[in-house]
């Protein structure tokens, strides 16, 4: 059953996207997650690719619009993406932009390929830091083979 506020949320997201040069693709509300997750997918009006920076900028605008609308009184996580957007983080800006987002880190440890999932905390010169159930784990950058955004909804 769709969330009762989904039509209002779609209207708000569509207006916010249009004002920033994007068009709305999809809005989903996942109430089974704690906190609730609101996923918004956007595309550029001109058809060009949406970058990670575009998602971050739109996230700020959408968050302001949500707060001003007072549609939701409970806590929520806002996720902005685009169909087909690249999910690997490479640049320092990527790591700053997606601080706090769910990630999976692939790395090598003593000839084994390992994976850790958590919330991106930061990347320093020596380590990638992720929050796993409230504890910060440091993974040496030399060992990291890939850091990619994940979707907490599965």
From Swiss-Prot:
GO annotation, cellular component aspect: cytosol
Pfam families: RimP_N
UniProt entry keywords in alphabetical sequence: Cytoplasm, Ribosome biogenesis
GO BP annotations listed: ribosomal small subunit assembly; translation
Matches recorded under InterPro entries: Ribosome_maturation_RimP (IPR003728), RimP_N (IPR028989), RimP_N_sf (IPR035956)
Record's signal peptide: none
Cellular compartment(s): Cytoplasm
Major subcellular location class: cytoplasm
NCBIfam families in the record: PRK14634.1 (NF011227)
Function noted in UniProt: Required for maturation of 30S ribosomal subunits.
Family, similarity comment: Belongs to the RimP family.
Protein name: Ribosome maturation factor RimP
Gene source species: Prochlorococcus marinus (strain MIT 9313)
Lineage of producing organism: Bacteria, Bacillati, Cyanobacteriota, Cyanophyceae, Synechococcales
Gene name tied to this protein: rimP
